[in-house]
Amino acid sequence: MEKSFEDVLVQFYIDQYRENAKKSTGKPVKLAHYIHRLNSKAKSIKYARFSKNETVALDKLHQEIKRLALITYYSNNKNAKHILNREIIPQLVRVDMEQFDEKEAEYLTEDFLKLLRKEYIGAICTRSMKALYNEYRSKELRREIVTLVPARPELEFPKAQSMKRRFILHIGPTNSGKTYQALERLKLAQNGVYLGPLRLLALEVYEKMNDAGIPCTMLTGQECLEVSDSRITASTVEMLDCDKEYDIAVIDEAQMVADDDRGHSWTRAILGTLAGEIHICMSPVAKDVVIHLINLCHDEYEIREYERKTALKLEDKPFSFPQDVKEGDAFIVFSKKSVLNIAGRLEENGIKPSVIYGSLPPEIRRRQMTLFNEKKTQVVVSTDAIGMGLNLPVRRIVFLEVEKFDGVSRRPLVISEIKQIAGRAGRFGLYDTGYVTALGQKNLNYLKNTLNIPEQDIDIVSLGFPQVLLTMDAPLDAIIKLWHEAEPSAPFRKINVDEILFLYGYAYKERYFIADFDDKYLLYKMITCPIDIKDRELVRQWLRYCMSYTSDISLDKPDKHSKYQGLMKYESYYKKLDLYYQFSVRMGKIVDEDWLENERDKTQAKIMQLLSKSKDEYIIRCRYCGRILPIGNSRNICRDCYSMIRR
């Protein structure tokens, strides 16, 4: 009668424990004592249950049985061997097998046991079968990753490698006119593309081109504004089609190539854009790494360097708030809470501000900028969003803070961040000089000292996940983790995968309700949908779409109900509208364009209405006496109340 595979497994365990015992030097023992221990273990293991992936406890169980097996096989007692071989080890096999899901269990074959006998001799005596399986699969997957992914990133783009491309590098600081020159050349294209970091910049190019009589389409993750017979596509860099050929391309803000989260899109654009003429606009710090990428492709390049068109001066005296406020000032802080706090204080002093921060919808940011451009507001309060190519008539940049939270910790601004923001002062054509200052002598000294330090060149290039790995026979999260663990050669560094793994984990809990969860191409589309994972209402809507996208030709409309209040409620709803559009496009669903445009318009109007109202409620006050706190106070309590509490 042919043995079942379970019997084969039991025999494998017995053989491994017996072989391990032969290598050990036995010592005289009281056999009766060990018979008692064997019976006790046989009884306890019969009812043992372990949660999935409880590997430490399972390994410990294997080690306990190893000690019992040493005595059993050394003593060669028939009764002891019966208890071990017929009662304990079969139950150990059961416990081990309960750790495997149905798909994983397919790998447990006689060939796999042969491999364990050869490469993992005796390992089952100290480690669970799942631990050995995980180690083996990891090794196999790493080998497969090395096989599938070219050793050199440029080889992932064979079409671009086969072309003769010429790069023109426009290198200069902010307000130097580098992007203007590249766009002037783009106007001559019959089939051109602009690739920028922000929807607002794509919109600016879209409007300038169409105003100049050059048909231009805008394409971003949030929307598509299609113009018939367009010669130019203005888009965010993530939207690049690496299979489409252009005659001229412009890649803007290429110093972003080092960004942990989005930098891989610039790397992909430089290595993979199919255009005979490619203009790259960047800060001087990115010059060497961008040239390195071009050299990898054996393409030609020329360098055009630009000087700042207006002088930039650091003021001698620190800024005092609100006494020193002047029209044309831009106040820099690093959170939405701080932006609204400063805006409220300015309004208290009769000064109308525009506000710019990351969670504002792009169209609202644009309207706030327009108010400032048209002098309907006197100043602007912004996060570092102001530093990324936004053209505003700013006379002076005022750093109210010189520290920011970067997602991990609160840290001082680095020189590249200071220069990027400070460079927005003194718009060419409006001012001869741009000014920079900071609140308080300590902050001003920090700016002064930091600006004297030579800016470090970028020495990192971000690499994205290669989708060729989606062909591998393994869970998607395991593939992503193993790919990320493998260190690339300098100057490459792999993108941060924390957010997509978070979304994978969120979806995995509901995998039985997600159609085609095992389709890695489909699942990867879902988990790389760009959403704010800090907004849990948004994450829940994303999960609902994952579970229901096959139900109809269109997705359900976003839920207006929210636990949030005021501005946050409408900002979150706007993000839900963006998710409705993005998920629909990714999954081939029909978008109700008229409804979406109407909802966006209504939501934008509501946000603008709320921003036009008094921001007194956002001013940070002492939680005890209600007194307005000094800017930068981190305790939410005034000095007098703090002193009273400390008495």
What are these regions (language model features)?
Residues 168, 284-287, 293-295, 299-345, ...:
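Conserved interdomain linker/interface between the two RecA-like ATPase lobes of SF2 helicase motors
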Residues 285-286, 392, 396-399, 403-406, ...:
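Conserved segment of the helicase C-terminal RecA-like domain
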Residues 191-202, 279-281, 324-349, 353-357, ...:
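Conserved strand-helix element at the start of the C-terminal RecA-like helicase core
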Residues 1-147, 466-647:
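Non-catalytic terminal extensions of ATP-dependent helicases
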Residues 224-226, 354-355, 360-383:
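Conserved helicase ATPase core of P-loop NTP-dependent helicases/translocases
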Residues 256-307:
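Post-DEXD/H (motif II) to motif III coupling segment of the RecA-like Helicase ATP-binding lobe
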Residues 209-245:
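Inter-Walker segment of RecA-like/P-loop motor cores
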Residues 176, 180-183, 188-211, 286:
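Conserved Walker A/P-loop ATP-binding site and its immediately adjacent core
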